[in-house]
Amino acid sequence: MSESASMLQGSKRGTDSSVDVGGAKRTKVDMDDGSSSNNDEKELLEATKADELDEVVDDYAEQNDHSAQEVAGEYVPKKPEQPIMLTKDSNSGKYVFPPISKEDSLNARYFLKYHGSAQFLDSYLPEDLNSLYVFHLIKLLGFQLKDRELLTAVQKAVQNDVTSGVSSVVGTNPMVERVSPPQLSASTPSGDGYDDPLEKKHAVRLIKDLQKAMNKVLSTRIRLANFFTLDHFISKLKSAKKVLVLTGAGISTSLGIPDFRSSKGFYSQVTNLGLDDPQDVFNLDIFMENPSVFYTIAEKILPPEHKFSPLHSFIKMIQDKGKLLRNYTQNIDNLESYAGIFKENIVQCHGSFATASCVTCHLKMPGERIFQQIKDREIPLCAYCYPKRQEEYPTVSDDPGTKNGQQSSHNSSSIFHMSRSFGVIKPDITFFGEALPLEFHTNIRQDVLQCDLLICIGTSLKVAPVSEIVNMVPAHVPQVLINRDPVKHAEFDLTLLGLCDDVAAFIAQKCGWDIPHENWPQLKQRNIQYDELERGMYYVYDPVKEQAKDTGQRQVQAP
């Protein structure tokens, strides 16, 4: 057995030794002590860092045989008929990796989570192996290494293109032969007869990378194998009793309210404020230093009064069907209340414009009372604190305006900072640096355990802790994303790309339900279509809008 195989066998023996990190299992390599070769291997393992891994499971070619076993609606991964076996090209003498399909990769990931590390390694790896088996197993789990030196070394030993997610064979010669890994003779002293296609440092790196890949699979959610089509979603939505809906800025853009992170979003519009980070507009420390930074641009995100989108009404429809467990919204526009969603069914994770409070005396008032001042780009002041503000800080301007045509700097003395924010009324929006509302923490723990369907709409899931809700929901609960762009750092079972209102109308049409919105009669008549982009991902669109968009783009591009 080669030394790389020996080191991996040590890893296989030690898979039951683990540490608990935030509820996730991390496997450790259990090396034998006593021999100099094992000590050398241990030092090499400790000195070698794991590579950066890219998840490429979605890049694998899809095979739609759907022969996976389903028992009581739960996917049971298949045990491989035999461990991985590499072949060799008869002409080049290079190893040939077997092809990997997306189905193969998903089954391997599910097998690891279902049966654990020890049984996974025993089932997928032969007793005699070399480092190339480890490389192939990493790819089978859906990961691609980024270390160029390591990839170059592997490429020299194999016929396949190792830089892509798909194990496509380079060259045209189909003649291959099954081979066993190189072996060390019994008389060969351990440590002196290293015989492996890769150098020992590369073999050690691969072992580290395999452990890292396995740890990531064990600690993250894997998509359900029996929930990936529109029909699956429609059927589940009809039968669900406790739907958890997580919404973001994308559900309000049809009303003219900008999102935050797109090229035309809010953050791209505030680059002229001289901030190191556009998100500092919502930084509590900066607001207390200079509230004019926020009030100069607050009108851009001020919600329209008593208006709401068809998507808001789509959530109301789910509520009216008795299916809505809770709507966790990251939006601050409070449009859910205008749509008729009950207060007890809404958690405004980042606060809202619904109310406002004095930062000094904490007097609370309806947010609408300061809307006109926000529109006029004035800093709203508390009537109770205003006399003291005038007495203590008579020279402080109450305008968010400018000095010599330039935006006022928020880098001033601490006394000036205190005076600028004294008695200022702030919308009850959760700024960066503030705790989330108590109702979030009160409800989320029980809601994630009770829900039977999670729908995330119009969000990029970039802001914690709300973004972690997808990882808190039990793994067997289907997760659906409705958004303009895919969210690659989460494992949604079904992704519906498109405009939120169009997707909502399409789903309502398929369910035979009516959305309680004034535009529903027109939306109901639209011939909304879809294209399947890949397994579990669809593009939903209105052909009329698409044609108009294409025409507009051609007109812009015309000389």
From Swiss-Prot:
Residues 39-51 have a biased composition (Basic and acidic residues). Its cofactor is Zn(2+). GO terms for cellular component: nucleus; Set3 complex. Keywords: Metal-binding, NAD, Nucleus, Repressor, Transcription, Transcription regulation, Transferase, Zinc. Binds 1 zinc ion per subunit. PANTHER family: NAD-DEPENDENT PROTEIN DEACETYLASE SIRTUIN-1, NAD-DEPENDENT PROTEIN DEACYLASE SIRTUIN-5, MITOCHONDRIAL-RELATED. Residues 52-62 have a biased composition (Acidic residues). NAD(+) binds at residues 248-267, 330-333, 458-460, 483-485, 500. It is found in: Nucleus. Residues 223-514 form the Deacetylase sirtuin-type domain. Its EC number is 2.3.1.286. The active site is at residue 350. One of its GO terms (molecular function) is metal ion binding. Belongs to the sirtuin family. Class I subfamily. It catalyses: N(6)-acetyl-L-lysyl-[protein] + NAD(+) + H2O = 2''-O-acetyl-ADP-D-ribose + nicotinamide + L-lysyl-[protein]. This is NAD-dependent histone deacetylase SIR2. It holds the Pfam family SIR2. Residues 1-73 are annotated as: Disordered. The keyword NAD applies. NAD-dependent deacetylase. Heterochromatin component that silences transcription at silent mating loci, telomeres and the ribosomal DNA, and that also suppresses recombination in the rDNA and extends replicative life span. It acts as a NAD-dependent histone deacetylase, which deacetylates 'Lys-9' and 'Lys-14' of Histone H3 and 'Lys-16' of Histone H4. GO terms for biological process: heterochromatin formation; negative regulation of meiotic nuclear division; negative regulation of mitotic recombination; regulation of thiamine biosynthetic process; silent mating-type cassette heterochromatin formation. It comes from the Eukaryota. Zn(2+) binds at residues 358, 361, 382, 385.
